[in-house]
Amino acid sequence: MSVTIHTKPFGTIQVDSKQILKFPQGLLGFEEFDEYALIEESAESPFKWLQSTKESGLAFIVIQPELFMNQYKPAISDEELHDIGLTSWKDGIIFLIVTIPHDNPKGMTANLQGPIILNGKEGKGKQCISRDENHSIRKNIIESMEEMSSEKV
């Protein structure tokens, strides 16, 4: 079954109802919006959009951490994830919110401190706070990709 969503980046689109995720507590700062669609702009892009189903202007660019850094492990207690049906963050899919400066796209950063954990089986998600003090809210993605590729050589 498809659902119609109005978005600013893509206009009015149809998404499969399986792409709709419930966030029981919303996202930090946007608690009143508890339903989002995970939209893939293109198969080649490492980025996806987390688009509110209720507010066309509310969308976040997200990325999975393993695409630009090694061994990201959020410091989250297992109890924090029980309300979305997970016993550990390792059982979920992790996304990080990306910020892209208008004047410097190469300066794009990911928020390591506020990971979004998804339970794909139940269609639920939650934004948590990682208590690891080394997790920056502005981890440079391009620099991290370059570091990761130089480690493989």
UniProtKB/Swiss-Prot annotation:
Subcellular locations according to the entry: Cytoplasm
Protein's UniProt keywords contain Cytoplasm: yes
BP-aspect Gene Ontology terms: bacterial-type flagellum assembly; regulation of translation
Keywords, ordered alphabetically: Bacterial flagellum biogenesis, Chaperone, Cytoplasm, Translation regulation
Record HAMAP family: FliW
NCBIfam families: PRK13285.1-1 (NF009793)
The name this protein goes by in its record: Flagellar assembly factor FliW
